[in-house]
Regions:
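Structured, basic alpha/beta domains of bacterial-type, RNA-associated proteins
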Residues: 1-125, 132
């Protein structure tokens, strides 16, 4: 079961946001929340909010436990770029690019391992081996 949450037009460059999301991939949701609380990167606070939103979506919409969730995907794509200008010497102007990005988190529930049923061949082999060892 996949649960998604997204953050659009986040006012931070994609490069800076990728630094944090790269480390989150594959982590359990609880571990990732603890890590995000301790990191001092600028985007970690907003990614923590996004992670909490994704966990709330999973609990509310699909009745999943937070302990079973892990981060399957963390995508950061570039968004629109706001173009501003700064006055410079001799009447010139230089461009300032204020970059944005879109972040998408995908959580999945880890399936608990179920006891496998032995096939007939496996059970017959086990019986034969036990008979041989007894005689």
């Amino acid at each position: 079961m996949q649960v998604k949450a997204s953050l659009k037009n986040y006012r931070r460059s994609a490069r800076k946001a990728r630094e944090v999301t790269r480390l989150l991939r594959g982590m359990k949701a609880e571990e990732a929340a603890v890590q995000l609380m301790t990191w001092e990167k600028g985007s970690s606070e907003d990614l923590l909010k996004l992670l909490k939103s994704a966990v709330a979506n999973a609990q509310n919409n699909f009745k999943l436990n937070e302990e079973d969730l892990y981060i399957a995907e963390a995508k950061v794509n570039e968004g629109a770029t706001l173009k501003r200008w700064r006055a410079r010497a001799y009447g010139r102007a230089t461009q300032i690019l204020k970059r944005t990005c879109h972040i998408e988190l995908t959580l999945e529930a880890q399936e608990k391992p179920e006891a496998k049923e032995k096939s007939k061949k496996e059970s017959e082999k086990a019986e034969e081996e036990s008979r041989k060892s007894q005689s």
